[in-house]
Amino acid sequence: MRLHDLKPAEGSTKKKKRVGRGIGSGHGKTSGRGHKGQNARSGGGVRPGFEGGQMPLTRRIPKRGFTNIFKKEYAIVNVGTLEERFEDGAEITPEVLIEKGIIKDVKDGVKILGDGELTKKLTVKAHKFSQSAVEKIQAVGGKAEVI
């Protein structure tokens, strides 16, 4: 096989549709736009979501809920992740979690959740803990400190 033998796979390449290049091409005269009307015009067409004067779906459906401006968003870490990534007796702080790439940023704080198993004795400093996380950390002799 040589370079001149290479061909793209069957059906993987399509020819560009050249419009307005004579009647014989099949895309001449109106260039596939039909006759007159809004869509035949330059810059014509309706905006997305426009339903021809009928009340649009987005306005037919009732409004629901609101956005709580006081909502706190925590960076969450499970105890199972701490088990995998840290040595026995390690002290874990939000800065260490960012350094190790476990979380991207602290957001409104770090919350430790109780998913997974923990066998190592760790000192964990975070903004919030779930009840199950505290139980698992203390069960193996570790400390859960709220900062």
UniProtKB/Swiss-Prot annotation:
Keywords: Ribonucleoprotein, Ribosomal protein, RNA-binding, rRNA-binding
Entry's Gene Ontology cellular component terms: cytosolic large ribosomal subunit
Annotated region (Disordered), positions in chain: 1-58
Keyword S-adenosyl-L-methionine in annotation: no
One of the record's GO molecular function terms: rRNA binding
Biased composition (Gly residues): 42-52
InterPro entries tied to this protein: Ribosomal_uL15, Ribosomal_uL15/eL18, Ribosomal_uL15/eL18_sf, Ribosomal_uL15_bac-type, Ribosomal_uL15_CS
A Pfam family assignment: Ribosomal_L27A
GO biological process per UniProt: translation
PROSITE patterns noted in UniProt: RIBOSOMAL_L15
Superkingdom of the organism of origin: Bacteria
PANTHER family referenced in this protein's UniProt entry, alphabetically: 50S RIBOSOMAL PROTEIN L15, LARGE RIBOSOMAL SUBUNIT PROTEIN UL15M
The family this protein is said to belong to: Belongs to the universal ribosomal protein uL15 family.
Function according to Swiss-Prot or TrEMBL: Binds to the 23S rRNA.
UniProt subunit comment: Part of the 50S ribosomal subunit.
Protein name, per record: Large ribosomal subunit protein uL15
Organism classification: Bacteria, Bacillati, Bacillota, Clostridia, Thermoanaerobacterales
Gene (UniProt): rplO
